[in-house]
């Protein structure tokens, strides 16, 4: 075929998608329609395919969280959480190993690395769903937890009655009725013996056993009885207080127990008995006894170092402990009073590390001054079956106990077992009015609700669990949370219900109680397991603008007074995400951006917070990511780039596509910056999808700075000519048809970082797979990649003038294509409008391409766009040059009518 008389109109600039203006008006070098392609310098190609990295997870769950965690030994471990609530880790390359099961199912997650641990927040996209957790490569523990639900049973001077006392050869042997805990280096006070010659203060000569000791005294041989023996001590006379603190294996000191007091006689030691047990708390490695000086109200403890008294108990089985201290030694110890202000961190949506602190947001609101609602504060009473801080009912507590199955959400949980005979089981209460300090729990005219996690144990078929408010004097017995066996299973389920009338009670009786019990004669040998009770004002279920901040270098301690920040409170928005940029901490709300920084003096509650933007925000925890000293924010109006100044929109060219995002599910979108390949990936739910079913990809490969990304859009405007034009160095957008619930840059054993994607639901179901984007994979796990690129409509007005062709019908006679790949290159032409495609002959691809591909087409049209692509498993293309040969229609350049 001859192409004599035709004009070549080469296209070697392949820009990104632009659909915010009519396709017929686009300048040369951009695309009105493309998908599943990636951009190279001077070329466009099929995007990387999906390579399944691991054996699919059983049950085909979706994978809702991915993150690389660097362990203390510097080994990189990919962490993954699936929709079944299982945490996985890649401990050996290519193999996932289960770390923990039983996390909240169907939850997403975010995390941050700090202090060689990974801190994880599980959420529903809006607020927290599960307790905050930390993973150190060995243990998956809760972040912060309550302290003991009650203090020790008693504290008293160490003094024992003497059962027998005798003197032989100037050595006195003493038998006591109870242990005194004395050491061979101690002195003992003997008083009240019938034979007064024995009385006095003497150095111990030897300890025979816990009930027998000797001391030297020159006198005649004799024996006697009565009296007391007390080791000489240093405790000052007067009223002292004692509280108990749990110490975890992560080094966290909990909030102290409610304190108890005793009056010391002076000059003796003290025996602390009934110390809260930690048998149900696997992460507690020690207990600390904190004391006040005589008549004081500030608590201190000492650690036994440098000759100081020992107040740490490392034997977790011990229920009693003898202490000896002077007020001088005590007050020179470690101050513990501030620990009473600690609050247990609630379920949060996100977490970030900054200035050696952790910051958490999206917390579910709860009251923090009830006793042992999570049952992590220990058990006591008969058989250690009563949760500390609760009062067992004298008649109906039978059947209540700690759960011995080890199935707690975390730490301990409360079990109510039936016997098939007695109707009411496991009844226990605590006051609903105020805590031991007098701080209010419930207020009049305020409605309250409760969250409770429940599961069954055994073959439970009858009975009803109740968590409600009760008063005998006023006849109050609210419905509260009620759970029947048909509502639960062997997995934890959370129930939320009001426990008071909507407007609360007009007056609060003195006997107002929170009650937990089961009635309806629960099945013998089966019952209810109860955990994580949370009480909150019904109208304030979430802390929308509050950010919890830990102490510096103390990531589990959250002060209820100074350890939080209020970010533009009461503005109708919620803190959704956070990021770091140039030593500053930014908080992103739904439609605003705020910044703070460590002032080096105060706790976070006193830091200054400034608003950066009152328009740019994100609906998603994962809606922000950081690139090379800049951040990107995905919001309802578009994608914005922020480099410390004013956020600049960088997605205007695809606004119609952005508008297809289902913002009712906007909390599920995610953003990830691939700094190696210079791409920004944004997974979004479009149409009616409720999770990300499309990835919007911005290629900035040819751009070297944030300023260029902001300013060099797909189409530029010439102030000289007043016309639009495209350039090679520009933003290039393209949608990728990939369904993925999560994305991360995974650190690999070869030293590279690769984009990993957690599968999302396709057809309503997941497949249990984690994918890697791979340039050597030419299918999506065996499925064809339908990749194509559509050119602009040839010719632009400028080129018509340049080639002197005029703006009438043209004959497109021939195509020359420089492309390589595999499979067949599919070609279509759109004459005058995208709505009217014409299929062209396919062309075989090879790599490398030995020559240009040529095709006669003889196509008429005022303007024509061409689409090239592949759509078979293993097929791919790379297009570097596209040349149509054309001339004015030699027969009828105009129709002469319509």
What is each PLM-predicted segment?
Residues 375, 379, 425-464, 495-503, ...:
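Extra-cytoplasmic beta-strand recognition segments
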Residues 496-533, 860-873:
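Extracellular beta-strand ligand-recognition surfaces/modules
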Residues 474-508, 840-858:
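Extracellular carbohydrate recognition and processing domains
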Residues 381-417:
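Extracellular glycan-recognition surfaces and repeat-rich motifs
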Residues 1-97, 103-117, 239, 249, ...:
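Beta-sheet repeat architectures centered on beta-propellers
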Residues 2-7, 14, 57-60, 89, ...:
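Disordered, low-complexity "stalk" and linker segments at domain junctions of extracellular
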Residues 50-62, 101-105, 142-155, 235-237, ...:
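Beta-propeller and closely related beta-pinwheel folds
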Residues 180-208, 249-256, 290-303, 472-475:
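Ser/Thr/Gly-rich low-complexity blocks that favor extended beta-strand/coil architectures
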């Amino acid at each position: 075929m001859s192409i004599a008389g035709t004009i070549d109109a080469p296209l070697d600039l392949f820009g990104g998608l632009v659909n915010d203006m009519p396709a017929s008006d686009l300048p040369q070098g951009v695309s009105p329609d493309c998908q599943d392609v990636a951009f190279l310098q001077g070329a466009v190609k099929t995007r990387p395919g999906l390579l399944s990295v691991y054996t699919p997870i059983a049950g085909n769950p979706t994978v809702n969280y991915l993150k690389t965690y660097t362990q203390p030994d510097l080994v990189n471990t990919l962490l993954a959480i699936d929709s079944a609530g299982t945490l996985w880790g890649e401990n050996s390359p290519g193999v996932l190993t289960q770390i923990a099961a039983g996390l909240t199912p169907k939850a997403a997650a975010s995390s941050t690395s700090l202090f060689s641990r990974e801190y994880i927040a599980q959420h529903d996209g809006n607020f927290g769903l599960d307790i905050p957790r930390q993973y150190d490569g060995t243990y998956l523990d809760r972040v912060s937890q309550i302290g003991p639900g009650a203090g020790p049973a008693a504290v008293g001077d160490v003094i024992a009655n003497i059962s027998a006392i005798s003197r032989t050869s100037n050595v006195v042997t003493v038998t006591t009725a109870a242990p005194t805990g004395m050491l061979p280096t101690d002195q003992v006070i003997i008083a009240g013996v019938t034979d007064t010659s024995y009385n006095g203060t003497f150095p111990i000569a030897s300890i025979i056993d816990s009930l027998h000791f000797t001391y030297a005294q020159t006198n005649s041989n004799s024996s006697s009885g009565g009296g007391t023996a007390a080791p000489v001590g240093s405790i000052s006379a007067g009223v002292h207080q004692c509280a108990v603190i749990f110490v975890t294996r992560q080094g966290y000191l909990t909030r102290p127990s409610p304190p108890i007091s005793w009056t010391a006689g002076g000059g003796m030691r003290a025996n602390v008995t009934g110390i809260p047990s930690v048998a149900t708390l696997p992460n507690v490695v020690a207990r600390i006894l904190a004391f006040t000086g005589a008549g004081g109200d500030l608590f201190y403890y000492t650690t036994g170092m440098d000759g100081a008294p020992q107040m740490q108990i490392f034997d977790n089985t011990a229920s009693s402990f003898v202490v000896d201290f002077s007020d001088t030694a005590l007050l020179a110890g470690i101050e513990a009073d501030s620990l009473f202000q600690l609050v247990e961190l609630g379920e949060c949506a996100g977490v970030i590390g900054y200035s050696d602190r952790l910051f958490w947001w999206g917390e579910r609101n709860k009251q923090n001054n009830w006793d042992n609602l999570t049952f992590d504060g220990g058990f006591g009473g008969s058989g250690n079956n009563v949760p500390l801080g609760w009062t067992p009912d004298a008649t109906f507590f039978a059947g209540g106990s700690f759960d011995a199955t080890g199935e707690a959400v975390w730490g301990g949980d409360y079990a109510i077992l039936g016997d098939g005979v007695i109707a009411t089981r496991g009844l226990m209460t605590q006051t609903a009015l105020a805590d031991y300090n007098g701080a209010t729990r419930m207020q009049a005219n305020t409605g309250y609700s409760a969250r409770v996690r429940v599961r069954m144990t055994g073959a439970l078929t009858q009975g009803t669990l109740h968590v409600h408010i009760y008063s005998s004097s006023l006849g109050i017995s609210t419905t509260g949370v009620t759970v029947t066996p048909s509502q639960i299973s062997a997995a934890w389920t959370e129930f939320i219900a009001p426990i008071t009338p909507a407007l609360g009670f007009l007056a609060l009786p003195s006997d107002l109680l929170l009650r937990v019990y089961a009635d309806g004669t629960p099945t013998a040998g089966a019952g209810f397991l109860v955990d994580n009770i949370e009480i909150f004002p019904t109208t304030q279920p979430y802390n929308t603008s509050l950010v919890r901040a830990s102490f510096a270098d103390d990531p589990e301690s959250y002060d209820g007074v100074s350890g939080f920040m209020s970010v533009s409170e009461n503005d109708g928005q919620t803190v959704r995400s956070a990021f770091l940029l140039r030593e500053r901490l930014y908080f992103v709300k739904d439609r605003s951006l705020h910044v703070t920084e460590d002032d080096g003096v105060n706790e976070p509650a006193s830091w200054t917070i400034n608003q950066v933007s009152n328009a740019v925000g994100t609906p998603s925890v994962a809606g922000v990511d950081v690139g090379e000293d800049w951040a990107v924010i995905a919001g309802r109006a578009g994608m914005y780039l922020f480099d410390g100044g004013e956020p600049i929109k960088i997605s205007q060219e695809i606004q119609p596509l952005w508008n297809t995002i289902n913002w009712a599910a906007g909390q599920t979108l995610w953003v990830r910056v691939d700094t190696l390949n210079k791409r920004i990936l944004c997974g979004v739910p479009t149409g009616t999808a409720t999770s990300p079913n499309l990835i919007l990809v911005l290629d900035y490969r040819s751009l070297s700075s944030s300023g260029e990304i902001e300013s060099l859009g797909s189409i530029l405007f010439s102030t000289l000519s007043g016309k639009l034009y495209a350039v090679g160095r520009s933003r290039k957008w393209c949608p990728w048809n990939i369904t993925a619930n999560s994305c991360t840059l995974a650190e690999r054993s070869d030293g590279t970082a690769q984009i990993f994607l957690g599968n999302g639901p396709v057809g309503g179901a997941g497949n249990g797979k984690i994918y890697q984007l791979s340039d050597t994979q030419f299918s999506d796990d065996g499925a064809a990649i339908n990749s194509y690129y559509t050119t602009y409509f040839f010719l632009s007005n400028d080129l018509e003038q340049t080639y002197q062709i005029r703006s009438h019908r043209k004959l497109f006679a021939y195509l020359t294509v420089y492309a390589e790949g595999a499979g067949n290159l599919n070609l279509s032409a759109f004459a005058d409008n995208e709505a009217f495609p014409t299929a062209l002959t396919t062309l075989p691809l090879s790599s490398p391409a030995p020559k240009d591909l040529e095709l006669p087409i003889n196509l008429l049209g005022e303007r024509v766009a061409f689409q090239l692509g592949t759509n078979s498993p293993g097929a791919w293309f790379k297009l570097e040059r596209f040349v149509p040969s054309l001339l004015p229609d030699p027969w009828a350049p105009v129709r002469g009518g319509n």
